[in-house]
Amino acid sequence: YEHLSVVKKIYKKNNIKSYVNSFFKDINNYIGKASLVISRAGSSTIHENIIAGIPAIYFPIKNSVGNHQYENALVLKKNKAAWIFNEEDIGSGIFLKRLSKIITQPELLKQFSFNNKNLGKPFASQRLKEIILSLEVKDV
């Protein structure tokens, strides 16, 4: 929470239209407007961004079980659909330098968006249901 006010000031100073909060209950009202998401790397968040085709900057929680947040984000990074940063990158200035480069390259954001969409499987659960229902149960 301590970084929220700092981030808001930075965006305002640089005339970047943004919605900054620690949690959005009504994420659907915002995700369609976003050209870039900055968030943690939980699986639900990542899948929402993939399906929406929105490139993201992820800050995985260091102490997540099995380092799963980093592993989640790494799949997207390897597919050029997201960037990964550590919390230490905020204080060191690394993050702001990279963020400035990212947001001033619309073609890069467009490419990462395209790559996200290619990773998505929006009808996967429906397809799985169809496969399961099509299986013939045989008497043993």
Placement of each model-derived feature along the sequence:
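A short, well-ordered alpha-helix in the C-terminal region of glycosyltransferases
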Residues: L108-P122
